[in-house]
Structures are given as structure tokens and as C-alpha cells.
Regions:
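Acidic, surface-exposed loops and disordered segments
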Residues: 1-192
Length: 192
């Protein structure tokens, strides 16, 4: 168990096929989005005020580690059968499993389904800078030339993946403070 930067305990682990049990991943349910994965990074987080932020932070750290090992990854938030993964991972009462990440070696040639999914999600297009980053308040775009040493970090935020390529994040710089916000759409409503 690890604790996220906002104080929520998070458990992460790997569910993997082995030479002794090559069928270990069968039946987990990814709705056909993942083929040939050798494993999944799964996790559980206790319910709480900042649980999703802490889960996301620690999951992304695990993904960066896997990427450093030359493994391909793919976040799965709405395209996996949570009950099957939760059962396999051992999610306890009072915990939830917001997402899993497939891990494995990237396919040499992308499949038709991959390119179709990317096209439907509009994955090759990103919102323009002025729709993501603001100076002082919404409606006042933050000029790229005004961010100095933060230019690369903000560019990476702009290029980063998001569910269905919605890019829901917005950043408002107010003097020396940076406010990170989520723009919710009718498809991305707050949890109750």
C-alpha cells in the first residue's frame, strides 16, 4: 500500500499471465479493446475526498515506470469489466477500482480497430493552447511566450492522453500560483 500526495491510501499490483498459467487473463473483460496484453496494473483506493487524484497520481507513476522498461500501456477506465478485475485483484469493502492499465509490448503493426478507435476518439487532435491555459481568469488566454520555464510542462499537459480525448483539464495562472481545474461535460459528470 502507498499513500498518494493528498493522503489517500492506494494499493497497486500486477495481474499477469505466467508460463504456468497462460490463461490467467482470460475472462477479465476489456470489451475487445485490448488484445495480447501480458498483464494489467490494477489498483484499489479507499473512498474519500481526494481518492481519485491520489489513485491517478500513483497509477501514472507506475505507468511511467513500465514505460521506462519499454512496455506499452493503455489506461482503461470505462472499457473494462470492473467487477471481474475487482474480484481478481481483491478489492475490499470501502474501496473502489477506478481504472486499470494494460501492459505489454506494443504491436508491430496497428490493427484496424486501433486506428478506428483513435479516429472515433479524435486522438490525433488536441485542443489549442488558448482553450486550455489562462491568465488570471477564464476567457483570458495565457500567452505561450509568458510561461518561461513552464513551457515544456504545459505542452506535455496539452499533448497528454485523456479519456475519449476530452482534455478536460484547464490551468489558470494567477501571479505565481497555478490552478488546475477540470471542465466537466454532460458525458463527464461529477460523482455523487
Amino acid at each position: 500500500s502507498q499513500v498518494g500526495p493528498l493522503g489517500t491510501p492506494v494499493r497497486l499490483g500486477v495481474i499477469a499471465a505466467t508460463d504456468e498459467d497462460p490463461g490467467a487473463l482470460r475472462g477479465l473483460g476489456t470489451y475487445g479493446f485490448i488484445k495480447g496484453a501480458t498483464g494489467y496494473i490494477a489498483g484499489a483506493v479507499v473512498h474519500g475526498k481526494h481518492n481519485l487524484e491520489d489513485f491517478g497520481y500513483l497509477m501514472e507513476r507506475a505507468i511511467l515506470f513500465a514505460t521506462d522498461l519499454d512496455l506499452g500501456t493503455c489506461w482503461l477506465g470505462g472499457t473494462f469489466t470492473k467487477s471481474r478485475f475487482a474480484s481478481r485483484f481483491g478489492v475490499h469493502d470501502g474501496e473502489e477500482m477506478p481504472a486499470v492499465t494494460s501492459i505489454g509490448y506494443d504491436a508491430e503493426q496497428p490493427h484496424l480497430q486501433d486506428s478506428t478507435s483513435r479516429r472515433v476518439a479524435n486522438s490525433s487532435h488536441r485542443l489549442p493552447w488558448e482553450r486550455l491555459f489562462f491568465e488570471g481568469r477564464f476567457g483570458t488566454p495565457l500567452p505561450p511566450e509568458a510561461v518561461g520555464d513552464y513551457a515544456t510542462a504545459l505542452l506535455m499537459v496539452r499533448l497528454g492522453p485523456s479519456a475519449s480525448n476530452k482534455q478536460p483539464w484547464r490551468i489558470v495562472r494567477e501571479d505565481e500560483r497555478w490552478h488546475f481545474l477540470i471542465e466537466r461535460s454532460f458525458l463527464n459528470v461529477p460523482r455523487t
